[in-house]
């Protein structure tokens, strides 16, 4: 049954159509459709500039396909009028050159994939996309071509002069043709609604314009009083602009527009006004481009016209008036000396850079809370400034782009992002040096292109009273000082949507977020005191370590369940088992004891020991996978479909740490496949990170290797494959080898030779596991005894500096004896601060004993707490730490417990309340009634008594633990009964034979190693 291709904007499902496809290396390439299988619903995609052997069948609804020019769904139907032009071969157009300017050209051919082969009038032939071609006005067609057929229109070099010689009339004609096209295409555009304004956002993210200071009004001799108004903007537009009307005008013939422009009803009579205003600016470009001074900042080429329009003359009054009347009055009010001053610099202005194309039409009124009284200027001041700059400056200034506040690609600038993120203060620039005509004072205003279309119930800034905007307005433009208008007013924070405020509040505790660094989260958390902020910061950061490990574990489990692989790979599935280590069942257990399993492995590739600390808070039920690349999503609307589609090359940091797991589950589902693909790591001995041929995956680190490099064939893959790095990690100590042999320790299964039918370790796995547990228990008791020896040494020395750690008794109370929940919370917060710092600063946090919470050893807060029995068994099963961590772990734990003890003691004394034990959560009461009258000698004696009591309790625990070890030995000895040997053989009698066997085994293993070395070459 034939299927119908889906409707995907920007993708044409036909043979030969071009699109972008994602290859197996997770890179996007321009591609072409070779074949279409309508039965299966997939296409054969050919990656351009690659061999056809890389052609791949991809389903047409796959997320591995995207259009070359990514269209925004919400911009459909808001296209400019130029999109409706149908160009034909041989038609004269304006085509964009590499300097982003439009030059006259002729269409040579129209290609099938939607591109145009154009020939510029200097003979250069290029293939351009539709978006880089504009229609040439009818009155401009043919008139320049008749003067200079091929040599007149050459691209402009950076010096501002033409590469070839050409006359001034030709340059003027070029300027006229380019500017007229822009005027025709842009003046009839739709009113600047919030959705329509997003189109120009990629071109001009921030406009800078300069206004001469008020002081210059007194120095002018001729003042032309004008009555201007603020232009009536549509109600959906959320910017109030400072439009320019008093623009000096150069006399150019105005081209007549032949195309009908779609206008809205409220702007039906403003076409002629905008037309006149654009022509004035177009005339000024030739003289203005020479530059007011070298330090005058410019945007890109297509941003100069709005900058000039807004910099020339603002509106000092706000009376309601028709826009056509304003433009007509502006034409009649030009001073007489304008023509003379501009004509003096006419010869030089003809060779300067000229902003053409759509630059003259990108009129974007800034969102700036300025009162009209602050920006009144006189026309004569501007005229003198322009004329002096034209005469004194011959070479144009180099355009300086102001820094962008965001470092993402321009496709990622969405209205939701700008609506929810206030602009950072460092994006406001000051003009470094003024023009020669002014007195050193310019007024720099940054227009705020934040379109808040997605924010409901946000009032226009234009409708805000001046009292609210008052704190943001500079009231004094004093001599020698530069005043910069702030980017956002105080009221703009109140206008933000509730979602933005919520996310800012959630992100405040995160020390890694940029919201704290930029000060964006301050308004959202104004009610939080400084101490509460600190506690939140440490609470959040403390759980980051444990949550990351849990996410690693869940990500691997999720990937193990993924059966779909586009390449031919061997993917093993790890069987993770939960650890059950309850010694209370030993009275009834014999063989059941031997079936204990170890903890699941939570180590990812190259990571250290996973956090099993009881200090870390409980993580919630579902986590989100970490990604290799992270994107700053602070305050963003993650439900934006366009943004998620555009984030194919960067993966989202879907972290519960930043968002408190506030996401919708649909976003997690969509990014799951992409996250899987990005987390596929190829780490082979050949050091090539490309997938090629048959790939095998390591069971431990989940990295992929080439089977050829590993010397393994598809039919000879072992049941349990572990890569060379996991088998022998670099820098690993031999004494810590047992930490890495996890499967051997957990399952008791060793790797055997393939020609043996029976593997000894497989037959005796339970015995081996129980033996390992016995050794771990003995090792743990040894460490506890070592700690007891140190404590006895402290007990013997009355003046030992660590004796004060036992100032509080080891008397334990139950949880129900806590005085009040509030006191418990304060004490817990005090403990958490120290604990979180410890978890952050050390790779190996205090370990969680297994099923032994009721014993005193595990709940002690004693001096130099050793690794207990359960802890060592955990350390045997956990491969992530090395001996370097173990050597310093005792000292680190000692310091940590000293800090936590002191903080507990002092906080409890301040509040007069019970402390929280850092290890167990039991309550220990500290009585301070005799604190002031206590004798130092009596206090030392009390400390020694407390320590002695503690040592006795630990000794009792050691005794009970030795009883458990004895039961383990009995269980192991009972295995001899199953073999039929009632009496175990004498080990000393078999010692010589055992030595010979071990020696022979070493010789054989040496030979096997030599064979493996020779075969791997």
From Swiss-Prot:
Instruction: Say yes or no: keyword Nucleus present.
Output: yes
Annotated GO molecular function terms are: methylation-dependent protein binding; zinc ion binding
List locations, semicolon-separated.
Nucleus
Annotated GO biological processes are:
negative regulation of proteasomal ubiquitin-dependent protein catabolic process; negative regulation of protein catabolic process; regulation of transcription by RNA polymerase II
The record's region (Disordered) falls at 183-248, 307-371, 389-458, 473-585, 862-923
Q: Which InterPro entries match?
A: Agenet_dom_plant (IPR014002), KDM4-like_Tudor (IPR040477), PHF20-like (IPR043449), Tudor (IPR002999), Tudor_PHF20L1 (IPR047405), Zinc_finger_PHD-type_CS (IPR019786), Znf_FYVE_PHD (IPR011011), Znf_RING/FYVE/PHD (IPR013083)
Which controlled-vocabulary keywords does the entry list?
A: Acetylation, Isopeptide bond, Metal-binding, Nucleus, Phosphoprotein, Repeat, Ubl conjugation, Zinc, Zinc-finger
Q: Where is the composition biased (Low complexity)?
A: 515-527
Q: Which residues carry this modification: Phosphoserine?
A: 368, 433
Assigned GO CC terms: NSL complex; nucleoplasm
| Subunit field text | Interacts with methylated DNMT1 (DNMT1K142me1). Interacts with SOX2.
Q: What does this protein do?
A: Is a negative regulator of proteasomal degradation of a set of methylated proteins, including DNMT1 and SOX2. Involved in the maintainance of embryonic stem cells pluripotency, through the regulation of SOX2 levels.
Protein name per the record: PHD finger protein 20-like protein 1
**Organism, per UniProt?**
Homo sapiens
Q: What is the taxonomic lineage of the source species? A: Eukaryota, Metazoa, Chordata, Craniata, Vertebrata
């Amino acid at each position: 049954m034939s299927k119908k291709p889906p409707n995907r904007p920007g993708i044409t499902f036909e043979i030969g159509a071009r699109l972008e496809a994602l290859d197996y290396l997770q890179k996007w390439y321009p591609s072409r459709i070779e074949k279409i299988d309508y039965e299966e619903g997939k296409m054969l995609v050919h990656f351009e500039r690659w061999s056809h052997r890389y052609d791949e069948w991809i389903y047409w609804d796959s997320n591995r396909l995207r259009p070359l020019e990514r269209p925004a769904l919400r911009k459909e139907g808001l296209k400019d009028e130029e999109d409706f032009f149908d160009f034909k071969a041989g038609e004269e157009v304006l085509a964009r050159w590499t300097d982003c300017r439009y030059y006259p050209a002729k269409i040579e051919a129209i290609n099938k994939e939607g591109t145009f082969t154009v020939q510029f009038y200097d003979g250069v032939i290029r293939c351009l996309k539709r978006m880089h071609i504009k229609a040439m006005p009818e009155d401009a067609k043919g008139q320049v071509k008749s003067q200079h057929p091929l040599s007149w229109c050459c691209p402009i070099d950076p010096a501002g002069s033409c590469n070839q010689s050409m006359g001034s009339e030709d340059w003027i004609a070029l300027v006229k043709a380019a500017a007229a096209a822009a005027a025709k295409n842009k003046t009839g555009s739709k009113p600047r609604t919030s959705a329509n304004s997003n189109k120009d956002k990629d071109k001009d993210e921030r406009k800078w314009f300069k206004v001469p200071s008020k002081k210059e009004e007194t120095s002018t001799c001729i003042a032309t009083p004008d009555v201007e108004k603020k232009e009536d903007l549509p109600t959906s537009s959320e910017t109030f602009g400072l439009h320019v009307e008093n623009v000096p005008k150069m006399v150019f013939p105005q081209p007549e527009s032949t195309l009908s422009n779609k206008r809205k009803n409220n702007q039906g009579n403003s076409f002629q006004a905008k037309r006149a205003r654009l022509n004035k600016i177009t005339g000024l470009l030739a003289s203005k481009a020479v530059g007011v001074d070298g330090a005058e900042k410019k945007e890109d080429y297509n941003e100069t016209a709005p900058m000039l329009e807004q910099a020339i003359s603002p509106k000092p009054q706000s009376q309601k008036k028709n826009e056509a009347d304003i433009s007509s009055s502006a034409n009649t009010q030009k001073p007489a000396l304008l023509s003379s001053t501009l004509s003096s610099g006419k010869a030089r202005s003809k060779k300067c850079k000229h902003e053409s194309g759509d630059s003259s039409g990108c009129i974007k009124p800034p969102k700036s809370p300025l009162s009209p009284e602050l920006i009144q200027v006189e026309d004569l001041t501007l005229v003198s400034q322009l004329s002096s700059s034209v005469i004194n400056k011959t070479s144009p200034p180099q355009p300086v782009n102001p820094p962008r506040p965001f470092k993402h690609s321009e496709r990622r600038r969405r209205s939701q992002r700008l609506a929810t993120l206030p602009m950072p203060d460092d994006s406001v620039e000051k003009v470094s040096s003024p023009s020669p005509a002014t007195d050193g004072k310019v007024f720099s205003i940054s227009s705020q292109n934040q379109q808040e279309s997605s924010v409901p119930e946000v009032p226009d800034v234009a409708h805000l009273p001046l009292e609210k905007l008052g704190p943001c307005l500079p009231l004094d433009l004093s001599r020698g000082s530069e005043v910069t208008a702030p980017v956002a007013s105080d009221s703009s924070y109140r206008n933000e949507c509730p979602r933005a405020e919520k996310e800012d509040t959630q992100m405040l505790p995160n020390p890694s977020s940029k919201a704290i660094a930029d000060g964006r989260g301050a308004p959202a958390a104004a009610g939080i005191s400084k101490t509460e902020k600190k506690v939140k910061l440490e609470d959040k950061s403390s759980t980051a370590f444990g949550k990351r490990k849990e996410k690693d574990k869940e990500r691997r489990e999720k990937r193990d369940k993924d059966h779909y692989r586009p390449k031919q790979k061997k993917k093993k599935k790890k069987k993770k088992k939960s650890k059950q280590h309850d010694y209370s069942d030993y009275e009834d257990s014999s063989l059941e004891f031997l079936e204990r399993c170890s903890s699941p492995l939570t180590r990812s590739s190259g990571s250290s020991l996973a956090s099993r600390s009881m200090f870390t808070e409980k993580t919630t039920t579902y986590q989100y996978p970490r990604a290799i690349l992270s994107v700053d999503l602070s305050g963003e609307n993650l439900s934006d479909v366009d943004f998620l589609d555009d984030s194919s090359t960067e993966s989202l940091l879907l972290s519960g740490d930043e968002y408190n797991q506030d996401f919708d589950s649909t976003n997690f589902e969509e990014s799951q496949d992409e996250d899987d693909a990005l987390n596929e790591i190829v780490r082979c001995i050949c050091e090539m990170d490309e997938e090629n041929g048959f790939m095998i995956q390591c069971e431990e680190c989940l990295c992929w290797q080439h089977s050829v490099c590993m010397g393994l064939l598809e039919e000879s893959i072992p049941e349990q494959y572990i890569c060379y790095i996991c088998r022998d990690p670099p820098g690993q100590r031999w004494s810590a080898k047992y930490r890495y042999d996890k499967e051997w320790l957990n399952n008791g299964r060793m790797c055997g030779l393939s020609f043996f039918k029976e593997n000894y370790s497989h037959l005796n796995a339970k015995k081996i596991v129980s033996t390992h547990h016995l050794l771990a228990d003995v090792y743990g008791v040894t460490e506890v005894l070592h700690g007891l020896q140190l404590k006895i040494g402290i007990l013997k020395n009355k003046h030992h500096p660590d004796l004060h750690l036992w100032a509080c008794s080891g008397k334990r109370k139950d949880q129900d004896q806590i005085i009040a929940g509030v006191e418990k919370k304060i004490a817990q917060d005090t403990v958490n601060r120290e604990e979180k710092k410890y978890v952050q600063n050390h790779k190996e946090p205090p370990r969680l004993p297994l099923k032994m919470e009721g014993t005193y050893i595990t709940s002690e807060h004693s001096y130099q707490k050793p690794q207990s029995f359960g802890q060592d068994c955990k350390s045997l099963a956990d491969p992530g730490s090395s001996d370097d961590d173990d050597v310093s772990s005792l000292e680190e734990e000692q310091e940590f417990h000293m800090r936590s003890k002191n903080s507990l003691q002092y906080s409890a004394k301040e509040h007069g309340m019970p402390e929280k034990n850092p290890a167990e959560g039991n309550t220990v009461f500290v009585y301070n009634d005799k604190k002031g009258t206590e004798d130092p000698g009596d206090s030392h004696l009390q400390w020694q008594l407390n320590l002695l009591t503690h040592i006795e309790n630990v000794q009792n625990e050691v005794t009970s633990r030795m009883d458990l070890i004895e039961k383990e030995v009995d269980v192991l000895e009972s295995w001899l009964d199953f073999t039929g040997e009632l009496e175990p053989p004498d080990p000393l009698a078999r010692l010589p034979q055992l030595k010979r066997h071990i020696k022979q085994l070493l010789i054989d293993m040496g030979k096997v190693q030599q064979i493996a070395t020779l075969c791997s070459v």
